[in-house]
């Protein structure tokens, strides 16, 4: 039953993203045209590193490192460092990093095994932690005070934005997109108050999905523990 509810919540979020991030459906109280900005009008590129997994560890201190594989598999649209632990670079390697990710920056995975290349995360709640953009990523630093927290993370993972990327994603065994091509895309820019309202709706949907996933995982662990007890004879079924 909970799995069905989870699937339904995920469908609802997808529908909300399709409607709200394109301007097809407007939230109450908002009207007027959205601006369309060229990528270069919105972002400047920051420096990334090329360190592999072997240069990373699960240490809670040190320079955090956003690896493209984690963007593709582990992280959602908005990566809040106050809520999610991410790997660190080994201390001697972390000492070499001079460019850091700030709140509101977008980190894009430029490489994948399929058309998921271009998946992005918006980083929030760094709270003074040093964070680097890692292997096969683009670090995109937006112009200040034009975007509400969460807007770019949700918009740049929407179908409407990803469709712009698809013609430029190239490769045979490995697919990738270049900086030279990603700058040919454009970004939709509603008024900042509307961005904030949309991001809040989608963030609420994310929280509901996350709570259901946690419930499902806890039930699985309980069943697994009970099976172990039954199989070892520690607990016997009453007959």
Please annotate each region the language model reported.
Residues 53, 129-138, 147, 162, ...:
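A short glycine-rich beta-alpha junction/loop motif
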Residues 45, 71-74, 114, 146, ...:
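Active-site/binding-pocket entry motifs
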Residues 40-57, 70-106:
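Sequence-specific dsDNA recognition surfaces
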């Amino acid at each position: 039953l909970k799995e069905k509810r989870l699937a339904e919540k995920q469908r609802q979020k997808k529908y909300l993203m399709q409607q709200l991030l394109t301007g097809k459906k407007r939230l109450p109280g908002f009207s007027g045209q959205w601006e369309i900005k060229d990528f270069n009008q919105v972002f400047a590129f920051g420096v990334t590193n090329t360190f592999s997994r072997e240069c990373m560890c699960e240490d809670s201190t040190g320079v955090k490192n956003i690896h493209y594989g984690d963007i593709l598999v582990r992280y959602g649209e908005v990566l809040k460092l106050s809520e999610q632990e991410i790997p660190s670079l080994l201390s001697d390697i972390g000492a070499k990093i001079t460019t850091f990710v700030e709140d509101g920056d977008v980190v894009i995975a430029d490489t994948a095994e399929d058309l998921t290349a271009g998946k992005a995360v918006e980083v929030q709640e760094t709270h003074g932690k040093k964070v680097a953009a890692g292997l096969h990523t683009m670090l995109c630093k937006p112009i200040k005070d034009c975007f509400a927290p969460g807007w770019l993370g949700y918009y740049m993972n929407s179908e409407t934005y990803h469709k712009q990327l698809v013609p430029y994603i190239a490769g045979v065994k490995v697919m990738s997109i270049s900086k030279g091509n990603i700058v040919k895309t454009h970004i939709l820019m509603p008024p900042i108050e509307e961005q904030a309202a949309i991001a809040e709706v989608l963030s609420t949907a994310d929280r509901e999905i996350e709570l259901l996933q946690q419930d499902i995982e806890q039930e699985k662990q309980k069943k697994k523990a009970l099976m172990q007890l039954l199989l070892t004879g520690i607990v016997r079924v009453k007959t």
